[in-house]
Amino acid sequence: MMSKQNKKDWKKFKDEHKEEHKVENEILEEETDEESQHQEPALGHPSYTALEEQLTLAEQKAHENWEKSVRALAELENVRRRMEREVANAHKYGVEKLISALLPVVDSLEQALQLADKNSDPSMHEGLELTMKLFLDALQKFDVEQIDPLGQTFDPQQHEAMSMQPAPGAPPNSVITVFQKGYKLSDRVIRPARVIVSTK
């Protein structure tokens, strides 16, 4: 049996130990509270909402960059086509200025041929005719074609009407006189034919 004194000592020991344990628990709770306050959510990672916002921004940026690259490629393709067209036109129409400068020479030869006819000089006429043929053959090698529309229907794309006159027996809107022949380089008119057109 425990004596009174022993009971007292045991009670005192228990109370002291209880108090100590209580203080330790309080300290532990305080430390845990402090740690939880300083700790970021989800072990230091940003929240789901923040990640979602970052993903949306990244997707928008990627879409913008994709659109820019598509536009840049389209522009590059347009530039390539334009350059190809310009090079092709340079090959096709590069001699246009030279041909235009030579056309008055052809006109002069034609006028000389008409005068030679009037003067009835066969040798002069033959020489001019040969020169004219050589000249036109040379122009043909450069894809130059003469427009001589006498009797044809008036075409404003290739003919320039100097005047309109009634012409019995001729269909309306047809070329009845050619003042000056026209010329085409490939499919481009470099000088329209100057003509008189019949009326109704």
From Swiss-Prot:
Annotated compartments: Cytoplasm
Keywords assigned by UniProt, alphabetized: Chaperone, Cytoplasm, Stress response
Record keyword Cytoplasm present: yes
Basic and acidic residues: bias regions: 1-25
CDD domains per UniProt: GrpE
InterPro entries with a match to the protein in the record: GrpE (IPR000740), GrpE_coiled_coil (IPR013805), GrpE_head (IPR009012)
Classification via Pfam families: GrpE (PF01025)
One GO process term, biological-process aspect: protein folding
Summary of the function given for this chain in its UniProt record: Participates actively in the response to hyperosmotic and heat shock by preventing the aggregation of stress-denatured proteins, in association with DnaK and GrpE. It is the nucleotide exchange factor for DnaK and may function as a thermosensor. Unfolded proteins bind initially to DnaJ; upon interaction with the DnaJ-bound protein, DnaK hydrolyzes its bound ATP, resulting in the formation of a stable complex. GrpE releases ADP from DnaK; ATP binding to DnaK triggers the release of the substrate protein, thus completing the reaction cycle.
HAMAP family cross-referenced by the UniProt entry: GrpE (MF_01151)
Subunit structure: Homodimer.
Name the record gives this protein: Protein GrpE
The species this protein was found in: Legionella pneumophila subsp. pneumophila (strain Philadelphia 1 / ATCC 33152 / DSM 7513)
Lineage: Bacteria, Pseudomonadati, Pseudomonadota, Gammaproteobacteria, Legionellales
Gene designation: grpE
